[in-house]
C-alpha cells in the first residue's frame, strides 16, 4: 500500500501517520528524515543536498527526487510506504509518478486531511518551548502545571517567532496556495481521498481505516 499524506501544518498529519505506520506496518517517510539519513550516510546526493542546506538554499528538485528514489528503492518499502512532505509541487508529483513506474510501483491513495485554516491558528500559536531543556507545551492541549513555567526545570517558557500569530497566518496562506494545484492534480488522477480533519483524532482515523481497509 503506497500512500501520500497531505494537510496543512497543524492538521494532524503526524498523529495520523503514527497510527497508520503502526497498524499497517509500512515505513513513514518524511522529506526531513530522508535528507538527514542521506547526509548521515554521506551518499553523493546527500552531500549535494547538504551543500545547498548549509548555504540556506532550497534543495533543487532533481536532488530531492533522487533522494526519494533511493529511499523508496529500499527493502523496507517493498510492501508499501507513507510519504509525508513530498511531493509539494505538481512538478515533483509528476517526477514521483515516473520514478514509481521505474520501480514498478504506483500510488494507491493520496490522503488529504482538510482543516479550516482559521481553526489551525490557535493550535499553532499555542506552542511554548522551554529554552533550557527543550520541552514543548501547548497553552490549550498540553499546558504546564504552572502557567508559563517549565515543569522540568522551572525556566520561563517562550514562544518561538515561527509560532507568533502573524507568522502563522502568513505560513498558512502560503501553504494553502501551494497545496491547491497539487490537490487538483491528484483529484484528476483519481488518487485523492479528502478527510475532514476538523474532528477528534479517533474519528478521523476511523475514516482512514475505512479507506485503507485490510490492504
Swiss-Prot record:
Annotated catalysed reactions: AMP + ATP = 2 ADP
Q: Which GO terms describe its cellular component?
A: cytoplasm
Kind of enzyme, top EC level?
Answer: transferase
Q: What is its EC number?
A: 2.7.4.3
Which residue ranges are recorded for the region named LID? 126-163
Positions with a binding annotation for ATP: 10-15, 127, 136-137, 199
Q: Which residues bind AMP?
A: 31, 36, 57-59, 85-88, 92, 160, 171
Task: Provide the residue positions that the database annotates as binding Zn(2+).
Answer: 130, 133, 150, 153
Ranges for region NMP: 30-59
Pathway stated in the Swiss-Prot or TrEMBL entry: Purine metabolism; AMP biosynthesis via salvage pathway; AMP from ADP: step 1/1
Question: What are the GO BP annotations of this UniProt entry?
Answer: AMP salvage
The family database entries (SUPFAM superfamilies) matched by this protein are listed as:
P-loop containing nucleoside triphosphate hydrolases
Molecular-function annotations in GO? adenylate kinase activity; ATP binding; zinc ion binding
- Annotated keywords: ATP-binding, Cytoplasm, Kinase, Metal-binding, Nucleotide biosynthesis, Nucleotide-binding, Transferase, Zinc
Q: What PROSITE patterns does the entry give? A: ADENYLATE_KINASE (PS00113)
This chain's function reads:
Catalyzes the reversible transfer of the terminal phosphate group between ATP and AMP. Plays an important role in cellular energy homeostasis and in adenine nucleotide metabolism.
Task: Tell me which family the UniProt entry assigns to this protein.
Answer: Belongs to the adenylate kinase family.
Q: How does it assemble?
A: Monomer.
Q: What is known of its domains?
A: Consists of three domains, a large central CORE domain and two small peripheral domains, NMPbind and LID, which undergo movements during catalysis. The LID domain closes over the site of phosphoryl transfer upon ATP binding. Assembling and dissambling the active center during each catalytic cycle provides an effective means to prevent ATP hydrolysis. Some bacteria have evolved a zinc-coordinating structure that stabilizes the LID domain.
**What is the protein named?**
Adenylate kinase
Name of the coding gene: adk
